[in-house]
Amino acid sequence: MYKLWLLFDPRRTLVALSAFLFVLGLIIHFISLSTDRFNWLEGKPAVRA
């Protein structure tokens, strides 16, 4: 396993992985917001008990 880090710079690899996961999270949230079922910003108002 240590030979893998000899091929790739750990700093650049972890920064690239973090950026990828952040963008993936944004994409997933925007896809959820575009649906009627999972849009928590413009959803139906809460029913009072």
From Swiss-Prot:
GO terms for cellular component: organelle inner membrane; plasma membrane; plasma membrane light-harvesting complex. It is found in: Cell inner membrane. Pfam families: LHC (PF00556). One of its GO terms (biological process) is photosynthesis, light reaction. The keyword Cell membrane applies. Gene3D superfamilies: Light-harvesting complex. It is a single-pass type II membrane protein. The core complex is formed by different alpha and beta chains, binding bacteriochlorophyll molecules, and arranged most probably in tetrameric structures disposed around the reaction center. The non-pigmented gamma chains may constitute additional components. Antenna complexes are light-harvesting systems, which transfer the excitation energy to the reaction centers. This is Light-harvesting protein B-880 alpha chain. It comes from Rhodoblastus acidophilus (Rhodopseudomonas acidophila).
